[in-house]
Design a protein with these regions (language model features):
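Short, glycine-/polar-rich solvent-exposed loops and beta-turns at beta-strand/coil boundaries
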Residues: 9-17, 67-68, 145-148
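Short histidine-centered loop motifs in beta-beta connectors
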Residues: 7-9, 78, 94, 111-135, ...
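LysM (lysin motif) carbohydrate-binding repeats in extracellular/periplasmic proteins that recognize
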Residues: 1-20, 100-102
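Surface-exposed, glycine-biased beta-strand/turn segments
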Residues: 17-103, 134, 163
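Short, exposed beta-strand-loop hairpins at the edges of beta-sheets
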Residues: 143-146, 154-158
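Zn2+-dependent peptidoglycan hydrolase active-site motif and core
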Residues: 86-125, 150-155
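Short glycine/proline-centered loop/turn elements that form peptide/ligand docking sites
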Residues: 101, 125-128, 137, 143-148
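Residue-level recognition of beta-strand microenvironments
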Residues: 64, 94-95, 124, 141-144
Length: 170
């Protein structure tokens, strides 16, 4: 683990700090995090834009779309924070590998060539084939896949071309 380059420890176990995320080569076990209880009448859904798009989570934009991050954006929030459908559509994928890349993730087809991806989930709140509305909870923020901290990685594609989500979100 100390020698595993992705951990950035330079071979020195003294570089491990409390709260550090440590990758275990070949590790497979993921401990699911229970979602927080839903409060009756909760109104924590992010506001929608005039075109119907809404933020995938309430949190801090930590990685905007651009040359260093050309596929999407990252919104940081605590593990267990709800992840919302950014627009209405049909869930086309629920799954993923907890150790690699996107980790647990969901893909939604919004029609007219639009598709969104939500990555690094701890748990899912939808099944493949389900229809969702903008603002519906589809999962919860986690630490699955390649991640440096709890966040949702959000991609928006139109006809297979990556779009800057900030051009669509309120």
């Amino acid at each position: 683990i100390v020698e595993f380059r992705a951990n950035g420890l330079a071979g020195d176990p003294n570089n491990i700090q409390p709260g550090s995320l440590i990758l275990v080569p070949g590790g497979k076990k993921v401990v699911p995090v229970a979602p927080p209880p839903v409060r009756p009448g909760a109104t924590d859904i992010p506001p929608a834009s005039e075109s119907g798009w809404t933020w995938p989570a309430l949190g801090l934009l930590t990685s905007p779309f651009g040359p260093a991050h050309p596929l999407g954006i990252d919104v940081a929030a605590p593990v267990g924070t709800p992840i919302y459908a950014a627009n209405s559509g049909q869930v086309t994928f629920v799954g993923g590998n907890p150790c690699c890349s996107y980790g647990y993730h969901v893909i939604i087809d919004h029609g007219n060539g639009y598709e969104t991806l939500y990555a690094h989930m701890s748990t899912f709140a939808v099944e493949s084939g389900a229809w969702v509305n903008a603002g519906d909870v589809i999962g919860y923020i986690g630490l699955t896949g390649r991640t440096t901290g709890p966040h949702v990685h959000f991609e928006l594609r139109r006809n297979g071309v990556y779009q800057d989500p900030l051009n669509y979100l309120p």
